[in-house]
């Protein structure tokens, strides 16, 4: 990569010397155990778009773009590299670190911000949330393709649609969807139902509609995008209802 880049602009406006090794570490992580991909190819594609005082945010987006541009019929595995890079960005944006926070901390934080439904805290004890947290398999994020992870980032993860601020990562979404849907089940058995359903949806065994993926667990409590419309059994009534 272009080592002549002098400074990178951080989120708080500070500048610091461009750290090539940091880029290497991220790409090494993103390509671990993925065959037929090249760190240097990704770096070369990103190199021509770097400039002095580039925002740190843009550097990571360039890496994502560079990996995505290498996806082809001959080199399909770059779709998993690009997906990991998107997921890395999601976690940094949400948690300011690569490791997700404990589930209970995420729930408390997002309920306080008004983006999660407070009923989650009413329906589940901290101990129950901790049990669910211990069951979450964050490494399942590695099974996403680039297209799938971008769809999560842009469509399904709870976020401020105006500022694009994200409040969760994929496995948190899956676990809280399961927890919300089974919240009224008997307390003696519901954690098993939640875990089983989490396993099903987080391994793509069942595909959920957008309203459930994006709305369940939030204050909107949206479960469906369908609307029931009633009309009489006459052509005039049907036409009037449709308009």
Where are these regions (language model features)?
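Extended catalytic cores of very large enzyme megasubunits
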Residues: 1-243
């Amino acid at each position: 990569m272009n080592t002549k880049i002098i400074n990178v602009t951080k989120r708080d406006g500070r500048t610091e010397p461009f750290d090539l090794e940091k880029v290497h570490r991220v790409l090494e992580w993103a390509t671990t155990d993925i065959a037929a991909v090249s760190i240097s190819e990704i770096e070369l594609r990103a190199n021509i778009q770097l400039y002095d005082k580039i925002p740190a945010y843009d550097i990571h987006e360039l890496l994502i773009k560079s990996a995505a541009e290498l996806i082809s019929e001959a080199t399909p595995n770059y779709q998993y590299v690009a997906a990991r890079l998107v997921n890395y960005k999601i976690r940094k944006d949400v948690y300011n670190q690569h490791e997700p926070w404990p589930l209970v901390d995420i729930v408390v934080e997002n309920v306080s911000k008004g983006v999660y439904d407070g009923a989650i805290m009413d329906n589940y004890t901290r101990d129950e949330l901790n049990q669910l947290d211990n069951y979450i398999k964050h490494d399942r994020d590695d099974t996403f393709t680039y297209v799938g992870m971008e769809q999560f980032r842009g469509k399904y993860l709870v976020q401020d649609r105006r500022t694009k601020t994200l409040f969760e990562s994929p496995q948190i979404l899956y676990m809280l969807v399961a927890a919300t849907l089974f919240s009224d089940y008997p307390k003696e058995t519901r954690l098993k139902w939640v875990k089983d359903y989490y396993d099903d949806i987080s391994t793509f065994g069942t595909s959920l509609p957008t309203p459930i993926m994006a709305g369940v667990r939030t204050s909107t409590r949206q479960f469906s995008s369908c609307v029931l419309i009633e009309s009489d059994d006459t052509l005039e009534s049907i036409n009037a209802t449709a308009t």
